[in-house]
Amino acid sequence: MAVVRVIHEALARGESPATLGLLHPDIEYVNPPGAVEPGTRRGIAAYEDALRSMDEAFDDVRIEVREIIDAVDQVVVLATYTARGRGSGAQRQHEDGYVWTIRDGKAVSFEWFHKQADALEAAGLRASG
C-alpha cells in the first residue's frame, strides 16, 4: 500500500511516478470506456502519454484520495476526480476507483474505473448485483 500512496502523492504534485522508479517498465495501463483515450496501453512511455493526454484535455485536474484498500494482490484507491474541460470550461466531478497491482515494489498494472463499485468488484472485494 505504501507504494500506491507514494504514487498518488507524486501525481498530486504533478510529478510522474516513473521519475521515482515506482513503475515497472512494462506497466499495463487500462483506461475505461468514455475516457479521453480508452483502452489498454503498455510501458512507461505509454503510461506517461496517457497522463499527458489528460493534462491536454483538462485544466485543474485533482484526484483526492478518499481511501486506500489492501486487496491481497492488489491495492484499490477510491478517489474523487475533478477537472475542468480545457476547451469547454465544463466542470467534471465523479467518484473513481483505481486498481493497482504491485510486485517487487513497482506498479505492474493500473486500471481506472469510473465507478468505485466496479473497482472493488475487479479486486474481488464486492460481488456484483
Describe every region a protein language model picked out.
Residues 1-26, 126:
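Short acidic-aromatic low-complexity motifs
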Residues 17-73:
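A solvent-exposed, acidic/Ser-Thr-rich amphipathic alpha-helical stretch
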Residues 40-41, 87-90, 118-124:
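A short, polar/proline- and glycine-enriched secondary-structure boundary/capping micro-motif
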Residues 56-57, 83-93:
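Short, cysteine-centered beta-strand-loop-beta hairpins and adjacent loop/turn segments enriched
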Residues 63-69, 82-83, 95-101, 111:
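Hydrophobic/aromatic beta-strand elements that line small-molecule binding cavities or substrate pockets
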Residues 72-81:
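A short hydrophobic beta-strand element
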Residues 97-121:
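Short beta-strand edge/turn micro-motifs at domain boundaries
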